[in-house]
């Protein structure tokens, strides 16, 4: 059973040899011919458990492991993995590959073998992502296997590509960010990544997907002091478009920075409350 109260408290005493003791399972799955490595954090108690894929940002220096543990304590499986071409995973890094890897992760979680081995409740599958992970989350929020999605300060690479042909300031800022992220990435460059955004801007731009997204259960958190996923660019445009079709978008504005550095517990509480509401929906 999922219980949001465990965001801020430890679970009751359990014996280490209890088969339902929390665990971390090292695992791997294949995405377009490449082996991806990851871990599944499994919670206390008997399953099946609601399960979320937790997607890190670009390139992944800001690791949301605290969020993974908080949600695991609440009673949820959490799958974490690195994208192709990042952090020692073989293959080439690209935003397109990241998108494909997310679909591969969903396929993996819904495979009969994974469902059995990890006690997965396939009626309660969720996507949670920060920054680039939020962008990836919103790209797959309409997948019918996903019950609801959480985007934490999503950074819209599609929008950057779409406006990059006429907004030199935003293009230059994005390019400089790409340059700082290359160390853990394989076979790419800031130039390659920027060109990929420019080539795919019309296809990836999230506001253009607003009609479809308006039919989904989505929480977006927004950091008021965020200088990366700037609100006026990466949230307000998208939210305005979604609200033209439906009012079911859940927004949470938090006075913090892009990493939620001083509000980690608050963002975890916010997400846990949203997930509990979704899990309790039939």
Labelled PLM ranges:
Residues 93-119:
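Alpha/beta-hydrolase active-site loop
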Residues 48-57:
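Short beta-strand element of the alpha/beta-hydrolase
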Residues 115-131:
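Alpha/beta-hydrolase fold nucleophile elbow
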Residues 68-90:
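Conserved alpha/beta-hydrolase
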Residues 146-148, 153-247, 252-262, 267-268, ...:
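The alpha/beta-hydrolase serine catalytic core
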Residues 2-46:
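N-terminal cap/lid segment of alpha/beta-hydrolase-fold proteins
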Residues 57-69, 232:
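The serine-hydrolase catalytic nucleophile loop
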Residues 134-144:
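Short glycine-enriched nucleophile-adjacent loop
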């Amino acid at each position: 059973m999922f219980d949001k109260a465990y965001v801020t408290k430890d679970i009751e005493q359990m014996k280490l040899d209890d088969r339902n003791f929390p665990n971390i399972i090292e695992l791997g799955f294949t995405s377009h011919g490449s082996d991806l490595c990851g871990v599944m954090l499994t919670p206390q108690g008997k399953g099946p458990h609601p399960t979320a894929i937790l997607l890190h940002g670009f390139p992944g220096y800001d690791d949301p492991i605290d969020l993974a543990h908080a949600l695991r304590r609440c009673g949820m499986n959490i799958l974490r993995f690195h994208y192709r071409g990042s952090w020692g995973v073989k293959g080439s890094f690209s935003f397109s590959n990241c998108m494909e890897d997310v679909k591969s992760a969903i396929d993996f979680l819904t495979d009969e073998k994974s469902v059995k081995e990890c006690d997965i409740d396939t009626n309660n599958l969720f996507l949670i992502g920060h920054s680039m992970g939020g962008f990836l989350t919103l790209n797959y929020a309409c997948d019918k296997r996903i019950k609801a999605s959480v985007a934490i300060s999503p950074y819209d690479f599609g929008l950057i590509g779409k406006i990059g042909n006429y907004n030199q300031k935003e293009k230059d800022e994005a390019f400089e960010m790409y340059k700082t992220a290359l160390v853990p990435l394989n076979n790419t460059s800031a130039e390659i990544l920027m060109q990929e955004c420019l080539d795919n801007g019309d296809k990836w731009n999230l506001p253009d997907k607003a009609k479809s997204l308006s039919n989904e259960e989505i929480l977006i958190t927004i950091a008021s002091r965020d200088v990366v996923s700037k609100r006026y660019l990466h949230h307000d445009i998208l939210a305005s478009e979604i609200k033209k079709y439906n009012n079911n978008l859940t927004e949470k504005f938090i006075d913090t920075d892009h990493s939620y550095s001083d509000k980690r517990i608050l963002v975890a509480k916010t997400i846990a409350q949203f997930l509990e509401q979704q899990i309790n929906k039939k």
